[in-house]
Design a protein with these regions (language model features):
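Active-site microenvironment for binding and transforming phosphate-containing groups
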Residues: 1-141
C-alpha cells in the first residue's frame, strides 16, 4: 500500500492510501470473509466504502462508517479519523482536501459527464472548505 500525508487545512492533514493486487482483494463484492480484517490492517478506522454507480451522487459522512455501501461515486466528511474509500481500475480516484474537509471521488468518463467532480467540490464547500487541493490517484489506463 502506498500511503501519503497531504495538507487538509491549517494544522491538519489527511492520509491517502492506494492499494494494488498485492495488498489483497478489496472489491466491494469480493469475499466477505476477512475483508473487514484486511481493511483494518491496511488503514485503521471505520471505513465508508461506496457501491459506485458511475454517476454524480455524493455521500456526506457525519459519523465514522456512515454511508457504508451507499450507491454513490463520492464521499466527503469533516469527521476526524474517517476512512473514505473508492475502488478504481480504468476510472480515476480523486482525493480532495481543504480546511478540515476531505473528499474522495470515483471519476470515470460517465461520472465526469454526470458532474461528479463539481458535485464533490460543491458539497465540500457547503461543509466549509475554501482552498482545495486535489490529488489524482493511479488507474490502469
Amino acid at each position: 500500500m502506498l500511503v501519503r500525508r497531504v495538507p487538509a487545512g491549517p494544522a491538519t492533514s489527511a492520509m491517502m492510501g492506494f492499494t494494488d493486487r498485492g495488498d489483497g482483494d478489496f472489491r466491494v463484492d469480493g469475499p466477505a470473509d476477512g475483508l473487514d480484517l484486511l481493511r483494518k490492517q491496511t488503514m485503521a478506522g471505520e471505513w465508508t466504502w461506496l457501491r459506485q454507480a458511475h454517476g454524480a451522487d455524493v455521500v456526506t459522512v457525519t459519523r465514522l462508517g456512515e454511508g457504508r455501501g451507499a450507491s454513490a461515486d463520492a464521499a466527503v466528511t469533516t469527521v476526524l479519523g474517517a476512512v473514505l474509500a473508492v475502488q478504481t481500475a480504468d476510472c480515476v480516484p480523486i482525493v480532495f482536501t481543504g480546511d478540515g474537509v476531505i473528499g474522495v471521488a470515483h471519476s470515470g468518463w460517465r461520472g465526469i459527464v454526470e458532474g461528479v467532480l463539481p458535485a464533490t467540490v460543491e458539497r465540500m464547500r457547503q461543509l466549509g472548505a475554501g482552498n482545495l487541493l486535489a490529488t489524482i490517484g493511479a488507474c490502469i489506463r
